[in-house]
Each structure stands twice: as C-alpha cells, then as structure tokens.
Amino acid sequence: MLKYIIPTIMLMPLTWMSKGNMIWINSTTHSLLISFTSLLLMNQFGDNSLNFSLMFFSDSLSTPLLILTMWLLPLMLMASQHHLSKENLTRKKLFITMLILLQLFLIMTFTAMELIFFYILFEATLVPTLIIITRWGNQTERLNAGLYFLFYTLAGSLPLLVALIYIQNMVGSLNFLMLQYWVQPMHNSWSNIFMWLACMMAFMVKMPLYGLHLWLPKAHVEAPIAGSMVLAAILLKLGGYGMLRITLILNPMTDFMAYPFIMLSLWGMIMTSSICLRQTDLKSLIGYSSVSHMALVIVAILIQTPWSYMGATALMIAHGLTSSMLFCLANSNYERIHSRTMILARGLQTLLPLMATWWLLASLTNLALPPTINLIGELFVMMSTFSWSNITIILMGMNMVIPALYSLYMLIMTQRGKYTYHINNISPSFTRENALMSLHILPLLLLSLNPKIILGPLY
C-alpha cells in the first residue's frame, strides 16, 4: 500500500522544487508512473482481500476505484494547464498540491479498514475540493457553490459519526473484516430505523440522491476543470463505495427501509434526465446527467443482489471515465469561446474536426452504446430491478431512451450547424487535449474487452 501512498506524498516536494517551465512535466510524468504501478492491483481475484496492514486493505470492490483515482491525477494536471497559465508560479504549485492532497486522501479512503478512519478521510476530501472550487472557480457564484457543497455534505454526514460511535459501543469494533462476523441482525424498531437513516444519508447526499442533489450542478458549474473532473469521477463514487460497505451491517433493515429511496431514485433519474433535455449550460447538463446515472447506482445497491452489485460497480467506473471526458470536452470549448452556453458554441465540427470525433465518442459512451461498460452496468442494474419488480421496466426503459436523447442533443448543438460569427480567432486543438481525450476513452474501450475486472467482489 505504501508504494502508492509514499510516491503520492513525494509528489508535493517535487512540485514545490520544480522550476517554472518544468512544473507540469514533472508532476504529470511522476503521477503517470504512480498510476501505472497501480495497475499491478488489477490481477486480484474476486474473493480475495489484500491486507496491507491493520489500517489498509483492498478487495475487488475498492481496487477499480483506487486505480481510477490514480489514473485521474495526471489527466487533471493535463487538463488544468491552460486554466492556470495566467497564474503566478506559487499559485500553480498550490493548485497542484491541492490535487495531490485530494488524491492522497482518496487513496486512503478507498483502502481504509476501520470505519472511523474511513469517515475521517471521507470528510478530509472535502477540504481540498472546497479550496479548489472557491479559489480557482470561474465566476463569483463559486462561493455560493462552495457553501452548498460544504453544508450539504457536512449536514449529511454528521449523523453517520454518531451512528458509528454507537456501533463502536455496541459491537466493540469498527473493522470491516471483523464486523462481518460480529454484527447482529438489526430488529425493526424506531431506534434502528434512525440508525439506518443516519448511516445511509451521508452517502446518499454524496451520491447524490434526487432531492438532495442541489449542490452538485452548482458545484460542477462553478468548479475549475480539475475540480469538475475529480468531483464527477471520484467524489460521487465515494458515496456508492460507502453504501456498498455499510449495507453489510444494516441487514435485514435494508429490505423494507429501501422502498422509499428506490422509488425516489427511479423517479429522480427520469426527472434529472428530463431536466438535461432543457439545459442551456453545457456543464450543468453534464452535471445533471451524472445525477441520473448515480440514481441507477443507488437503486442497484439498495436492491442488494449479486447482479445489482456487479452492475453498480461497473456503472461507477464507466461513469467516472465518461463524465470526466465530457467535462474535459466542455472545458476545451470554454477555453476557446469563453462561454458555456450551447447556443453560442454551434458548428464547431467545421473548425475543430478532431474534437468532433472525441465529442461523438464521449456522447456515445454516455448514452451507453454497446459494447461499452456503461451498457454492461446498465443492463445488470436493469435486469436486477426487473426481477425485483416488473413494473420498473417502464422507468428503466425511459432511462435508456432519455440519455440517448440528451447526449445526441448535446452533440448536435455543439458540433453541427453553421458556426456563429463571434468565433473569429479560435485556436486549433492541442496535442495535449487529444492525448487527454484518448487517455479517457482508451480505458473505457479496453475495459469493454474484459469487464470482469471491474465487476466487484461478487463476480
């Protein structure tokens, strides 16, 4: 485990000691090396658990998320270069340090063995993200967005702390591996209902559940590109990961407590997908689409069958790469046209033909085109919800159609048609951007050849 944590910590002195012209090259190459070493974790069997120490362990649920976390840092650094080109050197170094700190916290969160340790790190990821949003965001609205982000997440996760202390007093341990053997079945009582809510709400706000999702589009729209990427790709997956881990100790309460939340999520994914159809703001559209994809994951986790768990883990990884790529594309438009409104950025295919290819690929993966892992995840979730209740096929079918509509709408609005006249001096697409997009799309295509490595512990 230390072979990921120590190089990540050493990235910070590397950044601060680099000269101005070498800072991006050094940090990006070093973080790419870390992400390549993390691929060694891939050859892990489904039922295997690597116990690194008393603090850290990884199994086949946390491994794909861990690799995704490490894969995203070099991509975030590549994407942020233009955004920070006007800043002075100290600010650049501070920004990179924030990203590295965030990655460090996330690596430790996904491998934490104690629930309290997991909780502390889960909250610690809030601080660098908040600094990134409120310091390097684009508009003055970013302070408001940061407040929303902070208070939704904090108010959601404080009851979890109380619940964890209660479990510690009852059981005597919060170790993931011990809890499997020690935990008692929860009986149906008011105190246990509140306990269930306290444990689940923290992660449902983070996912976010429809109704508690208001912070997400705000935070996405105001965050700089690296903030948006890490928020969509990894911080939302923290919620799903936490839910998958904590449902272990909440049985058999989840069987009947899950009904309102499953209904809310099924309804919410249709609603947020429909909201996407009438968005004018590009980043807001991608933000709402990630709410609707995460609603599927909530449904899958609450149904609690092996198939739905596999679908949830596959969908989390697929959505992480897809939404991150879409945010990069939206940002490359924003850097050229200085506007996120889709009406002002029409007909870019004639100006940037290679970018149009990336837009097409990203839109197709977002609408779950076969044979991508997005489709594999969605099909697993769809089949498990259908076997849970037949009537959900209507909602699920709508949820297959509406993302196709808004993805194609986004593609046609930005790429097709006649370009607007205020686009006069537009820079061509850089090699950096093309490399960034290909590093997003290649893992998606390669994983669709062998999806079993991301199907989680039950495969």
From Swiss-Prot:
Alphabetical UniProt keywords = Electron transport, Membrane, Mitochondrion, Mitochondrion inner membrane, NAD, Respiratory chain, Translocase, Transmembrane, Transmembrane helix, Transport, Ubiquinone
Q: Which Pfam families match?
A: Oxidored_q5_N (PF01059), Proton_antipo_M (PF00361)
List, in alphabetical order, the Gene Ontology terms for molecular function in this entry.
NADH dehydrogenase (ubiquinone) activity; ubiquinone binding
Catalytic EC class = translocase
| Example of a GO cellular component annotation carried by this entry | mitochondrial inner membrane
The EC number(s) attached to this protein equal 7.1.1.2
GO biological process terms held by the UniProt record: electron transport coupled proton transport; mitochondrial electron transport, NADH to ubiquinone; mitochondrial respiratory chain complex I assembly
Q: Which domain of life is it from?
A: Eukaryota
Location within or outside the cell: Mitochondrion inner membrane
Which ranges does the record mark as transmembrane? 20-42, 60-80, 98-118, 147-167, 193-213, 224-244, 256-276, 285-307, 312-334, 351-371, 393-413, 435-455
Catalytic activity reported: a ubiquinone + NADH + 5 H(+)(in) = a ubiquinol + NAD(+) + 4 H(+)(out)
Task: State its role.
Answer: Core subunit of the mitochondrial membrane respiratory chain NADH dehydrogenase (Complex I) which catalyzes electron transfer from NADH through the respiratory chain, using ubiquinone as an electron acceptor. Essential for the catalytic activity and assembly of complex I.
Q: Which family does it belong to?
A: Belongs to the complex I subunit 4 family.
Assembly and binders: Core subunit of respiratory chain NADH dehydrogenase (Complex I) which is composed of 45 different subunits.
Q: Cross-referenced PANTHER family, in alphabetical order?
A: NADH-UBIQUINONE OXIDOREDUCTASE CHAIN 4
- Return the protein name: NADH-ubiquinone oxidoreductase chain 4
- Organism classification, top ranks? Eukaryota, Metazoa, Chordata, Craniata, Vertebrata
